Swiss-Prot record:
GO molecular function terms attached to this record: transmembrane transporter activity
Entry's localization field: Cell inner membrane
Recorded GO CC terms: plasma membrane
Protein name, as recorded: Multidrug resistance protein MdtL
CDD domains: MFS_MdfA_MDR_like
Keyword Electron transport tagged: no
UniProt keyword Transmembrane helix present: yes
InterPro entries according to UniProt: MFS (IPR011701), MFS_dom (IPR020846), MFS_trans_sf (IPR036259), Multidrug-R_MdtL (IPR023697)
Annotated family: Belongs to the major facilitator superfamily. DHA1 family. MdtL (TC 2.A.1.2.22) subfamily.
HAMAP family assigned to the protein according to its UniProt record, in alphabetical order: MFS_MdtL
Superkingdom of this protein's organism: Bacteria
Transmembrane portions of the chain: 4-24, 42-62, 69-89, 93-113, 131-151, 158-178, 217-237, 247-267, 271-291, 295-315, 328-350, 355-377
Gene3D superfamilies, alphabetized: Multidrug resistance protein D
């Protein structure tokens, strides 16, 4: 079991590392490529577009050909794309490399969740996904620090050499440590209930959890997107104060994420999901009534706590009905989360909604819709029947 957890964690970490590792070198990259920082900031959107593109295909390929081949190819693509970015001499080539990086990271991301669905039951999966969420919260804090230390002695290209090395390590883990977990054979009595036709992506329970996780990701990405404006322009923080504040909020996310597995031993998953949405609602109300920086910071802290306590549980429930189509389900969740959150941020910007109101709106909207879905759509018997562990059921 340890090999699956190690490989899944490594596969997921390529995604946040690809976002955060290079940011510290952005001014120097812009100068060397004769591009403005504003022009290169689109690299974030290009990276997410690459991830979404990979997710369109990676899940189905993983279900048909196996998790291991997709993981290996994804790691190789990420490694080669990182080298392409390091060799870029102008902006368009750099952005092409970023798009390919997103494709590699997206394939690995999808496979990681499919592996966890294949090897863990619902209770253990919820705990592991919560831990995984905590680990991914460490990357936005550590990656810029590591990047800064690297650039003290080496040029910005070394940041992408480091990411390329990460791709090599993940590829080697996938090649030599990871075992194939894709279900290859079911007992005859299970064929009818576990067929791809039965594992529908439009069943009410999956759609409800897809909506909850998409709204939750929209909350956290809106917070990340709006935080520079809120903290530095509205609240008057310096860059140093901003960095410290974001590090502290990441710390809150880590503490709550690492505590959630223990909470799952005491409370039902539904209870933790309701707590999560209750924290979102409280955060929205707090921010709407806040008149001091202290109260605003308290509201922002509630956002991080709410996301960390509920997201892993909701993702585990969403993957639960799928024993044969875990890859497709993981892809669908990833695409919905990336596209849904991007659509909200884009619409809010087009409509001229302020950063604070954008955040308050998604917090209150997410909490109300999610609470209604949690109460109205509960796991039924057919969902429980699909909750099998294909890898463990092999002879």
């Amino acid at each position: 079991m340890k090999r699956f957890l190690l490989c899944s964690f490594a596969l997921v970490l390529l995604y946040p590392a690809g976002i955060d590792m290079y940011l510290v070198g952005l001014p120097r990259i812009a100068a060397d490529l004769n591009a403005s920082e504003a022009q290169l900031h689109i690299a974030f959107s290009v990276y997410l577009a690459g991830m979404a593109t990979a997710m369109l295909f990676a899940g189905k390929i993983a279900d048909q050909s196996g998790r291991k081949p997709v993981a290996i190819v994804g790691a190789i693509v990420f490694m080669m794309a990182s080298l392409l970015c390091s060799r870029a001499s102008e902006g368009s080539l750099f952005l092409s490399g970023r798009f390919l990086q997103g494709i590699g990271a997206g394939g690995c991301y999808v496979v990681a969740f499919a592996i966890l669905r294949d090897t863990l039951d619902e209770h253990r999966r919820a705990k592991v996904l919560s831990l995984l969420n905590g680990i991914t919260c460490i990357v936005p804090v550590l990656a810029p620090v590591v990047g800064h230390l690297i650039m003290l002695r080496f040029p910005w290209q070394s940041l992408f050499y480091t990411m390329s090395a990460m791709g090599i390590i993940v590829g080697l883990l996938s090649l030599f440590i990871l075992r194939e977990t894709r279900p290859v054979r079911l007992a005859p009595r299970d064929l009818s209930r576990s067929s791809p036709a039965a594992e529908s992506l439009i069943n009410r329970f999956f759609v409800s959890r897809l909506a909850i996780t998409t709204l939750s990701v929209s909350v956290i990405l809106t917070f990340v997107n709006a935080s520079p404006v809120l903290l530095m322009e509205v609240m008057g923080f310096s860059r140093g104060d901003y960095a410290i504040t974001m590090a502290l909020t990441a710390g809150v996310s880590m503490v709550v994420s690492f505590s959630t597995p223990f909470a799952l031993g005491l409370f039902k998953p539904r209870t933790l999901m309701l707590v999560s949405q209750g924290l979102f609602l409280t955060a929205g109300v707090t921010l709407s009534l806040a008149h001091t920086n202290t109260v605003t910071l308290f509201g922002l802290t509630l956002i991080c706590a709410g996301f960390s306590v509920g997201f892993g549980v909701a993702m585990s429930q969403a993957l639960g009905p799928f024993s044969l189509r875990a890859g497709v389900a993981s892809s669908t969740l990833g695409i919905a989360q990336v596209c849904g959150s991007s659509l909200w941020i884009w619409l809010a910007a087009i409509l001229g909604i302020s950063a604070m109101n954008m955040l308050i709106g998604i917090l209150i909207g997410c909490s109300i819709v999610s609470i209604l879905l949690i109460f109205s759509v509960t796991p039924n018997r057919s969902v429980a029947e699909h909750e099998e562990i294909p890898y463990q059921s092999r002879p």
